[in-house]
UniProtKB/Swiss-Prot annotation:
This is Neuromedin-C. Stimulates the release of gastrin and other gastrointestinal hormones. One of its GO terms (cellular component) is extracellular region. Pfam families: Bombesin. PROSITE patterns: BOMBESIN. It comes from Pelophylax ridibundus (Marsh frog). The modification Methionine amide is found at residue 10. It is found in: Secreted; Cytoplasmic vesicle, Secretory vesicle lumen. Keywords: Amidation, Cytoplasmic vesicle, Secreted. GO terms for biological process: neuropeptide signaling pathway.
Amino acid sequence: GSHWAVGHLM
């Protein structure tokens, strides 16, 4: 699955 940081930080 994807991580939450990919949409938050990136």
